[in-house]
Amino acid sequence: QVDFQMGTGRIPMARPEAQAPSKKTKFTDEETASVGAYVASLAPGPKVPSPQSLNTSNLKAEELARGAELFKTNCSACHNIEGRGGALPEGAYAPSLMKTSNKHIYEAMRTGPQQMPVFSKSVITDQDAREIIGYLQTTHSEPNNGGFALGGIGPVTEGLFGWIIGIGGLVLIAGWLARKGARAK
């Protein structure tokens, strides 16, 4: 979708296996809307959601909890449970959703940019999408008072961190034991 690609700076690459990095957007909202209207005049496509359809301020606690479950089931394997992004196979990555607008999160669900699957309205309804977005807003607005936020980095980094600490500790202990044993003889 034109609005998502121009609005996020994640323009598709010439080779589909390459990961498109997010770039600073160079277009105003008006320019993006004009290009989107032109492309829509050529062929039908997903509509840009209205701000009212993405309003999450009136969601109840149960709906936010349901949004958390939907996100956990459909999104967290790639984006992390907090929406901070994560590693994918073959050097690709799922971007962080921390600073992504509600509109662009919704558009990404509907259009499936790059390696992301498309979530049609029969899979994730508009209400489901609002609940997921509401969950992300709630998660991102809560302060992290836990010190070193390793849990928000992602599974690959956490595993690497654990591997380095674990193996590094074993190597240090083995070296210490080897030197201690050599002196005892």
Regions found by a protein language model. Give the residues of each.
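Second-shell loop/turn segments in exported
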Residues: 21-25, 54-58, 118
